[in-house]
Amino acid sequence: MTDKRAVILLSGGLDSATVVAMAKAEGYSCYTMSFDYGQRHRAELNAAARVARDLGVVEHKVIGLNLDGIGGSALTDSNIDVPEAPSEGIPVTYVPARNTVFLSLALGWAEVLEARDIFIGVNAVDYSGYPDCRPEFVEAFERMANLATKAGVEGQGFRIQAPLQNMSKAQIVQAGMARGVDYSLTVSCYQADDDGRACGKCDSCRLRADGFKAAGVEDPTRYFSKVF
């Protein structure tokens, strides 16, 4: 293998689109992976496909999972309302073990591709408080990846890269703009409609809108309602 390959988790949202652009700017051949996991905001899958095309990735995979069969999250269980105000502690929009599952499948693909880098757009500054977005989780998963794989045991270790980890949402927006990300293609809303329009009320919408405002960048998000 002569090219520098990376597998990148691409949800279709602002953060993951920025990560794809950052990896590409670093010279990686980008292979993106999205998941149809029973999320109520399935419009993000269409957004992920748009972003992958626009940024010219080598290959984009969509993996089907039934995390809605497990439930326990407002994002996968229609009986749990998506909150419209920030809450204390870990919110009900946390999907149990989601990033662990996603990274595990990305790890498998990376091993097949002989890619040594896996990128994820987690952030621990302007975020919702999910435990699987913290630096401790990313570091622990990397250690596990190099214990649990043939490549890792043979000394061809993996790196889990989280370049947005310590960036504010405004800094993320600015980084993406500098690398040509078209944020109008992305969907971040937890309850976006089928056309990709955002609710303007959930925590993800609030963080996104605040990020554009703080960055001094016009918000390209389409809303079906907005309370900010």
Swiss-Prot record:
This protein's UniProt keywords: ATP-binding, Ligase, Metal-binding, Nucleotide-binding, Queuosine biosynthesis, Zinc
GO terms classed as biological process: queuosine biosynthetic process
Keyword Signal among UniProt keywords: no
GO MF annotation list: ATP binding; ligase activity, forming carbon-nitrogen bonds; zinc ion binding
Binding site for Zn(2+): 189, 199, 202, 205
UniProt pathway annotation: Purine metabolism; 7-cyano-7-deazaguanine biosynthesis
Catalyzed reactions: 7-carboxy-7-deazaguanine + NH4(+) + ATP = 7-cyano-7-deazaguanine + ADP + phosphate + H2O + H(+)
Cofactor binding, note field: Binds 1 zinc ion per subunit.
Cofactor(s) demanded: Zn(2+)
Described function: Catalyzes the ATP-dependent conversion of 7-carboxy-7-deazaguanine (CDG) to 7-cyano-7-deazaguanine (preQ(0)).
UniProt record similarity statement: Belongs to the QueC family.
Protein name: 7-cyano-7-deazaguanine synthase
